[in-house]
Amino acid sequence: VVGTAEAARGGGPMTRLAVLVPGGKGQVGSELAAILDARREDLVHAPGSAELDITDPESARDAVEAFAQAARDAELRPVVINTAAYTAVDAAESDPEGAQRVNVAGPAALAEACRDGGMPLLHVSTDYVFPGDADRPYEPGDDTGPRTVYGRTKLEGERAVLESGARAWIVRTAWVYGAHGGNFVKTMARLAAQRDELSVVDDQIGSPTWAADLARGLLELADPVAAGTGPQQRVLHCTNAGSTSWFEFARAIFAELGLDPNRVNPCTSADYPTRTPRPAYSVLSENAWREAGLTPLRPWQDALGEAFATSGGAFRHRG
């Protein structure tokens, strides 16, 4: 079961939060906004990039200052959860300046604004900061070694956030899918409607992570961070439990769609070359998350089942 701060405290009340979510129209940001809206006692502002450009230091500072004042007026504990990112892995290779602006300059400006405004920051990062050639799940303190522009800029963004001196926690995740935006689940549903058979790589291993579960995990962490407990800075990993290949994940998606999983065939990465190398193994360890007193996310298979049960229409291809 996905944990909440309430569960972590044995059923005690959660801190009433004021949460600013840059990147609020994306996969994770949309889920954060929905959960906080449903809680009703919290204040949430989840602007998209058109409303809040984190790459503009003045825009970031104004947004943080205004939200901090709104939190004070409502007598809520403020926290920023940054989900804004340049996530187009292949496009980043030909647009390194764009990736640098969003993944490095943006988080740096946001972190400096949070530092000066006295607001804690949770910054979402990625498994791509690692080389992707491990034989065991990556721990937060393991050596990084990104092999793509996307991964390099995300790692530089992490460092900029931590070096700002803000109260900041980095949360790395992987293989995210959800009802909003483009993702692997939606791609498989679209291709299933267009082709009799598909070939999907079976030599890349990771942990599929439902955006709604990740959002709940981030909010569980936001509770003590906003309350001022725990260390000033930390790096954690948060994904749904377990691991699989893209091939097996695709088969599971077909099953949820009510289709024959045998329509999906395995292939190697060499059979399906991409412009940018993908990690062969990028499973992230939950040990540090658990040691921080947080509830590990449920197995990826259970999350996928609920994603289809609650948001299935968003994943099914139309037309």
Q: What kind of region is each of these model predictions?
A:
Residues 44-63:
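Adenosine-cofactor binding site in Rossmann-like domains, unifying the SAM/SAH pocket
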Residues 245-251, 268-307, 315-316:
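Conserved C-terminal active-site "lid" loop/helix of NAD(P)H-dependent oxidoreductases
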Residues 217, 224-276, 315-319:
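Mid/C-terminal beta-alpha module of Rossmann-like enzyme folds, strongest
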